């Protein structure tokens, strides 16, 4: 099961939380599409700002948007001009009061989405898909990851037949729910068509192992 489903979705409620935090009865579909519009617009406008996750919280007629980025300066802009323009646009888009929070990602090489987007940008710049993957794997492991797996799919190197090729270093225990595994995807738009990029990063365990818990209880 762990090999098939998204590692992020599988761990929601165990070691991860939802990216959209609100409840609705009748307006659920409307608000869901509103969330999708917000994420699509923010991702498109800030495509060069290394944006990873966009969290959305709702309360009455207010929307709180938290943007996780490796380049907060680019999102905020000179004197806060960029983030203010973004806030006004989202207010017009949703018809609600929008508040924007910026969270800096301290170690972008441990964020699967940012690593996947970095590989995709390299592929668009005609860098070898093998070299792009190996460089990203090396940087991620140097940043403290326990393991990483990458996969690129499409007309690799301009081949006539599409195929998939990936690399794996360290351990990536997809079945272990207490394992903090980040998963991210990206697309590279090349002259030969689209190339999909997938990245899994194992950052260590979040919950204590059962043996440790049993030992502590026995010691008491």
From Swiss-Prot:
> One GO term of the cellular component aspect?
cytosolic small ribosomal subunit
Superkingdom: Bacteria
KH type-2 domain boundaries: 38-106
User: Which InterPro entries does this entry report, sorted A to Z?
Assistant: KH_dom, KH_dom-like_a/b, KH_dom_type_2, KH_sf_prok-type, Ribosomal_S3_C_sf, Ribosomal_uS3_bac-typ, Ribosomal_uS3_C, Ribosomal_uS3_CS
Q: Which GO terms describe its biological process?
A: translation
UniProt keywords (A-Z) are: Ribonucleoprotein, Ribosomal protein, RNA-binding, rRNA-binding
Q: One GO MF term, please? A: rRNA binding
Q: Name one Pfam family in it.
A: KH_2
The UniProt similarity line reads: Belongs to the universal ribosomal protein uS3 family.
- Subunit description: Part of the 30S ribosomal subunit. Forms a tight complex with proteins S10 and S14.
Q: What is this protein for, i.e. what is its function? A: Binds the lower part of the 30S subunit head. Binds mRNA in the 70S ribosome, positioning it for translation.
What is the recorded name of this protein? Small ribosomal subunit protein uS3
